[in-house]
Amino acid sequence: MAVWGPGGRLGLRGCLGARKLLCPRFQSRGPQGVEDGDRPQPSSKTPKVPKIYTKTGDKGFSSTFTGERRSKDDQVFEAVGTTDELSSAIGFAMELIAEKGHPFVEELQKIQCSLQDVGSALATPRSSAREAHLKHATFEAGPILELEQWIDKYSRQLPPLTAFILPSGGKSSSALHFCRAVCRRAERRVVPLVQTGETDANVVKFLNRLSDYLFTLARYTAMKEGNPEKIYKKNDLSDRT
């Protein structure tokens, strides 16, 4: 997961966030029918576009916000990478949800922004953080409280849960259930970092609450779309005889 440092410095590679337009892959290709060979050649005055690849991680190591070099399978990068995966899963779910015209797309986009803040906190291990880094290592409680408000809002409109439900309820609902499962894995990756004091405890609280939100929203989405939820039924082995 990429986290941009002050002044646009790339701290970790992966997602470009707000700076993605600097990457040629995300820029407009210009008028249709114009081939690359027909484009005007850049002059010496054309500003250089920074490359997406740095080659600094080719040996299996990457840098934290604090400048510390760690193996890419370090607990920090496991946690950062899983929260990035979660944000990507939410982005996919948002595309399905937007097609149905659901109004809570903005909530999910806000959550993606909060996950960028989570990544920033995770990528700033407190054991190597200096005073200037501490603002990146803190995750405020505001997003947690907001999730609780959203959960309560949707829960009041849902029928009571009387049985275990399976991930189901249509494409949008199933995508949100998948996001919930990824969120639980992200939480498991973060717990060791909190237990060792490397990361703000609010990060785990946020992910824990987020999984509850995603579960509730999946149920709410199925209800609004009129799709039935599949109920868990224990397999009866006696039926096979």
Swiss-Prot record:
Keyword terms of this UniProt record: Acetylation, ATP-binding, Mitochondrion, Nucleotide-binding, Phosphoprotein, Transferase, Transit peptide
Which protein, by its recorded name, is this? Corrinoid adenosyltransferase MMAB
**What enzyme class is recorded for this protein?**
transferase
One cellular component term from this protein's GO annotations in UniProt? mitochondrion
Q: Which residues bind ATP?
A: 54-63, 72, 184-188, 208
EC number of the protein: 2.5.1.-
* Native source species: Bos taurus (Bovine)
Annotated GO molecular function terms are:
ATP binding; cobalamin binding; corrinoid adenosyltransferase activity; transferase activity, transferring alkyl or aryl (other than methyl) groups
